[in-house]
Amino acid sequence: MTQANNTVYTDLSVDELVKEALQRGEGVLADTGALVVETGHRTGRSPADRFIVEEPSTQDAIAWGPINRKFPADKFDALWDRVEAFNNAQDHFVSYVHVGAAAEHYLPVKMTTQTAWQNLFGRCLFINPEQFNPAGRDQWQVLNVANFECVPERDGTNSDGCVIINFAAKKVLIAGMRYAGEMKKAMFSVQNFLLPAADVLPMHCAANIGEEGDVTLFFGLSGTGKTTLSADESRYLIGDDEHGWGEGVVFNMEGGCYAKCIDLSEKNEPVIWKAIKHGAVLENVVLDGNKHADYADVSLTQNSRAAYPLEHVAKRAEANLGGEPNAVIFLTCDLTGVLPPVSILNNEQAAYHFLSGYTALVGSTEMGSGGGIKSTFSTCFGAPFFPRPAGEYAELLIKRINAFGSKVYLVNTGWTGGGYGVGKRFSIPTTRGVIAAIQSGALVGTETEHLDIINLDVPKAVPGVETELLNPRNTWADKAAYDEAAKGLAKLFTENFKKFEVSDAIKAAGPQL
């Protein structure tokens, strides 16, 4: 299709998109065949530039505030028209994709991008259906125009870039953003608003499935280990980041993975390593003179990324879905060295820690957070992506856990033997040992020890894991220092939890001073 002197490229193949990106100077090829691109001054998401249009059909259901910022409908319409006109005056790329692998819950999406590489990214991360929109549902539109510069005084934006979701119009506008993660997270936010109305819990988690059909969920913020731990050569990958949990099913919302690349190694992450080949996209990864990726080089960002389709993963779940989860794992990266490598949670503790979402920002995906590491609380282990009040998601989680009988665990992938700078981080093999024990069922009904201040129950033995690591107090040389650190962490938890209106039983399930 041609408009004026420009071409609209529709549903190009991976090979064609790579060719277009190279011809247009958008990136270069690594020695593996992956397309390598740079995203400019934004190398992570920009939460301050994300808005939701305020309109009658959804305004009373959204938890408005610093995360879900209001945007006027008339300003949105004007800006959409402006960006669309800018995009229509030049070559651009259109693909028709789905978000949501379950037949009952997919969204059909027309994805329009100014650049070939961002279209390739979308083809990696979204689902490329054999038949587009077989149920004939209303279509969503994503318009992603990287080189458009917003003018805040004219457009009502916060800066030269924006991500704006309009539920009534079924539109997502992304302007001035080269960091492609904005596109996937915008559609994640859309599903996170829509799915609870269908009694489906949307989740910021990874998922995999064992040979016997047992499913494990891995909740966690960026950098806590979702992608790494779910990419297990002994299990089938469902997905690494975005899922829905409904009656009888856990389904991936995506068709690909978006892995952090910092210090990536073939030894520790063989599944991810092998997936980075022709058709994959490397964002902000530095190449050496031989076009070989240097994953230790953080000169562009600590948030370097690899986007690849699930087809690049040898062991993957058929149809990107599985049954309900036997094990639900909350991954937390504890900077204080106070939390144990694994705790067994009851339902009230599960609700408490799901609402708290305690972890650390590690090589954060958000702009402005810098390279430093700091503790944070992110409700539902993904606060930036959940438009509804947090309690609605927590109620759905407990409903699903109760109905299926899932077991819930808190797994610390952070520090032990002291806090950050003193202790050491749990090794990936140690954490994999914990995960393997959980998945084998070895921790169900096992003998536990109660840790008073942090109010957690830890197993006395975990197959394949050193026993002295299980009670964190034992790993500290200075026991009094551990007790003080535990009290400090408990105070952080209780201060953060004051904002939640929940039952006394859930309040009592957290750390106690």
Curated annotation (Swiss-Prot):
Its EC number is 4.1.1.49. Its main location: cytoplasm. Belongs to the phosphoenolpyruvate carboxykinase (ATP) family. One of its GO terms (cellular component) is cytosol. The keyword ATP-binding applies. Monomer. Gene3D superfamilies: 3.90.228.20, Phosphoenolpyruvate Carboxykinase, domain 1 (3.40.449.10), Phosphoenolpyruvate Carboxykinase, domain 2 (2.170.8.10). Substrate binds at residues 45, 179, 185, 305. PANTHER family: PHOSPHOENOLPYRUVATE CARBOXYKINASE (ATP) (PTHR30031:SF0), PHOSPHOENOLPYRUVATE CARBOXYKINASE ATP (PTHR30031). One of its GO terms (molecular function) is phosphoenolpyruvate carboxykinase (ATP) activity. Binds 1 Mn(2+) ion per subunit. Its cofactor is Mn(2+). It is an enzyme of class 4 (lyase). ATP binds at residues 185, 204, 220-228, 269, 305, 431. GO terms for biological process: gluconeogenesis. It is found in: Cytoplasm. Mn(2+) binds at residues 185, 204, 241. Pathway: Carbohydrate biosynthesis; gluconeogenesis. Involved in the gluconeogenesis. Catalyzes the conversion of oxaloacetate (OAA) to phosphoenolpyruvate (PEP) through direct phosphoryl transfer between the nucleoside triphosphate and OAA. The gene is pckA. The keyword ATP-binding applies. Signal peptide: none annotated. HAMAP family: PEPCK_ATP (MF_00453). NCBIfam families: pckA, PRK09344.1-2, PRK09344.1-3, PRK09344.1-5. It comes from the Bacteria. InterPro entries: PEP_carboxykinase_ATP, PEP_carboxykinase_C, PEP_carboxykinase_N, PEPCK_ATP_CS. This is Phosphoenolpyruvate carboxykinase (ATP).
